[in-house]
């Protein structure tokens, strides 16, 4: 059995205009330590998929199993990083991260709590901003806090919902490189959804393109045959990059034209 198994998951929403099928039967499997990306157009259902795996909403059909346990509600074994920073504005960087530490380690001594909290703040290179509040931070720094908070729960699975899409291009590239470094050190199991093909190729081991919907499904898996550690400067010149990018782009364009 895979570490994460998503089988036949469907989800519809009902509005005054009637029912809309968002996901029409999602199948997905991850091994422990894998970094998988789901790529699709805006509005295709990527956030709905993350919310289902995170236990924030229930599926209409199908099952989600993580490490042998069914997913039916939110839990500390699944960390989440959203597009919006979702930080508590009245708390410092330290206190925002410490909340996550407390959630999974309520019995820690004060010294151990401080050590663990500072460890994850240092992991995202924010030690100098430890006592600053979110309003004193740039957008990129706020998102680093969100990543630190997600990792501080030591989750079995980290879910990332377009975490860098609200950032400017330079900050986005910096945080992508930071995430590469952190993943290389921690080897966490990660699912990231994004509409940026190059971001997915840079970060992921395997990529699933998603059809536009309604009734979105995942297309065939595309393996990213790039060695790690990866360097964006040379990546675009490699045959593996060009093959992966061509496969994703052609699938998504064909879906838009109604050919897939």
Describe the residue ranges of each PLM region.
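Helix-to-loop junction immediately C-terminal to a conserved catalytic motif
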Residues: 54
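Conserved signature/switch motifs of ABC ATPase nucleotide-binding domains
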Residues: 132-135, 153
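Catalytic Walker B motif of ABC-type/P-loop ATPase nucleotide-binding domains
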Residues: 158-161
